[in-house]
C-alpha cells in the first residue's frame, strides 16, 4: 500500500518549539500572529500548487468553516471522521475509516495529497503513508496543547531536504520519510 499507491502524501504544518500545533482549546493565535510577523507566505503557495486533494479530520475541518472564502475551493477535500454527518457539507466527502478514504483517493485519481490536522497526520504516519513533512516552527513554548506527534508505531527515519529561516525567528524544515529498501 505505501509504495504502490498512485498519490503522494505531504504535511505542511506550523508547530511551537515544544511540538504543539494548537492550544488545548484549539486556539491558533500564537501561530498566526507570528506567521504574519515572519512575512511572506512561508512557502505555502509553492507547496499547495502540486496538491489536488486535502485530507483532514473533523477537528481541523470545523474551525476552517469560519474562513471566508473557503480556502480549498479549487481542491477536493476529504474529511476523516467517525462522527461528522456524511452530508454535512457539499464541498467535502466524509470517510469513516482510513481504508475507505484511501480507496476513494485512488478511485478519484488523486496525485498530491495534503494531510492536515494532528490526529490525521498521526494516523497516516502509523500507516506508513506520509512521504514528506514541512514543519514550520515558531519560536514560542506553549507548555501544553495539542501535540503534532504522539505514538506513531515505532521509529520513522527522516531525510533532511531543506531548512529556511524567515523573519521573526520562524524556521521551516522539510523532511522526506525514508522507506526500507
Regions found by a protein language model. Name each.
Residues 1-181:
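Enzymes that bind and transform nitrogen-containing heteroaromatic metabolites
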